[in-house]
Amino acid sequence: MNKIIIDGYYKEKECLGKISGIIFKNWEDNEPIDRISIIINNFDSYIPGEFYKRELPGIVKLLENIDLDKFDTIILDSHVWLWNDEESFEKSKPGLGAHLYKKLGRKNLNIIGIAKSYYRDNNLHTFQCFRGNSKNPLYVDSINQDKDYSEVIKSMYGNFRIPYLIKLADTESKINFK
């Protein structure tokens, strides 16, 4: 099964965004199978804690260009959860990844969030991933709150804090767009 890393870049003044996806098969791959990108307009402004309102429509539009039945994982440059409730999964506050999971309605599709910064009150099911010589972790969470994906992220190709294919998704969203 394939995996896709999705990232976006936005030009506020022009109200344009570019959403890019890097498609790969195995966690250790050093090159993508494919790259896809779309240009979007009329996106919402960034609001802390409601990042999904800006990102979700473009991500869904990008995913319309692939056969999701051939994918088992979507990786986002974002948190899946913003707040975790110890007693109830249903009481947890959804982040971009959880909103995407709900929108897609595919129980067999895993959503992993990889964030460069910690989000307050999101420590119960967020795992730290130290890569390379970095003293700063990546923060990894998933739709399956109890599953620790930090080891698979650590196994991804690249010597630095951010795995090569994740960095490539960021770069791809800016190529011919900045």
Regions found by a protein language model. Give the residues of each.
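C-terminal binding/interaction regions
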Residues: 1-6, 34-50, 56-69, 73, ...
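Short, compositionally biased "basic patch" segments
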Residues: 25-37
